[in-house]
Amino acid sequence: MAAAAPPPPPTAAPEPNMVAPLISPIGHPMFSRIRLATPSDVPFIHKLIHQMAVFERLTHLFSATESGLASTLFTSRPFQSFTVFLLEVSRSPFPATITSSPSPDFTPFFKTHNLDLPIDDPESYNFSPDMLNDVVVAGFVLFFPNYSSFLSKPGFYIEDIFVREPYRRKGFGSMLLTAVAKQAVKMGYGRVEWVVLDWNVNAIKFYEQMGAQILQEWRVCRLTGDALEAFDQVNI
């Protein structure tokens, strides 16, 4: 008769203030966090917006500068005006709290992903706010309040939502959109809306899978540049 196998060793308790990883016998664990951006994140936000302009084939419209973003993005409390959530990833668990920049306005979201293959990110050094802890910025969402007269409720308008190329199709975009939607529900808002380029069929399919309606009958109207400045000389 075969001898009984020895009992398995006890599972080590997670370290204090650390997010315990999911247990999986296979795969490559990746830890993610969504947090409020701060002024120190402006260089990463600027790079992300530029990469988004490249992806959307709209670099001819891109003129944002780091100084311009720094002077306009953080003038009000989060959710009262322009707000940015940053998506960060790491091969190590994140601390459960952000002691360097605590905020009473938002509690960060954490998630553990078990990937089939490791992620190859050749630009990680350009997007690392904390190189010592292997943290990399993988995406962002920029949004602000608007108002629906039909609902008589405020809502959120998403100006930008973007995930860097190495991190796409891994659930990170869903995390960013969910974070905004959850905040809208928490604040009693009536809707979240945004626009999508008509050629971006992958994004359209993704948004529909998330429950969004694509409003075919609406068109975006925009005054900007010289057309906007010309109104300075128009008498009312």
Swiss-Prot record:
Its main location: cytoplasm. InterPro entries: Acyl_CoA_acyltransferase, Diverse_Substrate_AcTransf, GNAT_dom. It is found in: Cytoplasm; Nucleus. Probable protein acetyltransferase with dual specificity triggering both N-alpha-acetylation (NTA) and epsilon-lysine acetylation (KA). This is GCN5-related N-acetyltransferase 8. Its EC number is 2.3.1.48. Expressed throughout the plant. It is an enzyme of class 2 (transferase). The lineage of its organism: Eukaryota, Viridiplantae, Streptophyta, Embryophyta, Tracheophyta. The active site is at Y207 (proton donor). One of its GO terms (molecular function) is protein-N-terminal amino-acid acetyltransferase activity. The gene is GNAT8. Belongs to the acetyltransferase family. GNAT subfamily.
